[in-house]
């Protein structure tokens, strides 16, 4: 067990940015254990983690070739829905090479409408979690058979990673899995779902370990209808948390460091770097207008919401 912990910590070090303070490295290193020892109420009592594989990236011209979904209750996978999907067209060579899904695998598979009908029945009214959620949500809801899933809350684990783990040098699913000691994904949808199940609970732990006033501050930035992922922050936010104040946060941390015989000047420089990281993480989540022109009106609304969120975050940092 000790050797496994050392290996996990070594993997995590590979993905943490240089000059990250030791206390932050230590906090990141304990997140997986924290996730294993805690539950997170409605956020993991009954959620469906989902991934899809497709013939390409075009929402207009490409089709599903695999759907995988796992129902997770308090950290345990209790039920699966996995199916190949016949796209009605040839699978491009590059996609077959990446996913190891070939034309013969999908030849006798259900068509997209049949597969999506099964998915809708499986998901029900549960929370849905996916990594880079816009891609999967668009592909499963663009047909009438899956359209009702637009009514579910979709949580993007990529959003959570960028906000709660800004000191990682990558927030790709594969890198997050490697950082926290999971098994490598094969780019099959079912493997990606298993990976996302692990990562999602680590990310819940990461948000739960953020300062409660900051979680509450983010929770107030948007409605769930406009930015589904804010549901995580609303659930974890303390109802009695005081408004977030950077000045008070700095003052408290300076006092702690002084008590440990460190210099306050060193801490201030460190915190300025952390603010830059947070602003950068927010800007990475905002893709810009050129991206949203090719997507749905819901995505355009989310873009507008994120612009407001970005300004709000930056303003709070300047207190």
Roles of regions detected by a PLM:
Residues 3-153, 166-187:
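Conserved non-catalytic scaffold segment of RNase H-like nuclease domains
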Residues 2-39, 201-311:
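Acidic two-metal-ion nuclease catalytic site recognized across multiple nuclease folds
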